[in-house]
Design a protein with these regions (language model features):
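Short, surface-exposed ligand-recognition loops at beta-strand->loop->(often short) alpha-helix junctions
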Residues: 9-21
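Glycine-rich beta-strand-turn "strand-cap" elements at beta-sheet edges
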Residues: 2, 39-46, 51, 74-99
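Active-site-flanking beta-strand signature of metal-NTP-handling nucleotidyl enzymes
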Residues: 3-8
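Feature marks short, surface-exposed loop/turn motifs that line or immediately flank catalytic pockets
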Residues: 12, 44-46, 60
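An amphipathic, aromatic/His-enriched active-site/gating alpha helix that lines ligand/cofactor pockets
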Residues: 27-36, 55-90
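Residue-level signal for secondary-structure boundary sites
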Residues: 16, 60-62, 97
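Short hydrophobic/aromatic beta-strand micro-patches
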Residues: 9, 53-55
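Short amphipathic alpha-helical/adjacent loop interface patches that line ligand
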Residues: 22, 26
């Protein structure tokens, strides 16, 4: 399993609209082969920041499968205008330690 991680900085005053847009965008990513799940959590210390975790079977399921699809174009239209700055997305492999 691959874990995708991004810290999303949402423009001030846009959190409620972002959360609504994110909920409406979930079916777009969920329809991707190799998609295993997603969580978007609000930061408790910094208003307007969110942590996105998405789980994928493979890196390619995200990079080629989702980002290469027409569903990603709609995802971008719904969500990308909320971010300032645009988030850096990283992908992580299997854990080296867990408890």
């Amino acid at each position: 399993m691959i874990l995708e991680q991004a810290v999303l900085a949402v423009r001030p005053g846009q959190s409620a609209a972002f959360e609504e847009a994110m909920r409406s965008a979930l079916p777009l990513i969920a329809a991707t082969p190799g998609f295993l799940g997603i969580e978007v959590r609000p930061c408790l210390e910094e208003s307007g920041k969110y942590l996105l975790f998405a789980r994928w079977e493979t890196l390619e399921a995200h990079t080629a499968g989702f980002r290469g699809s027409s569903r990603y174009e709609e995802w971008r239209r719904l969500l990308h205008h909320f971010y300032d700055p645009f988030p850096r997305v990283l992908h992580f492999g299997p854990p080296v330690a867990a408890a």
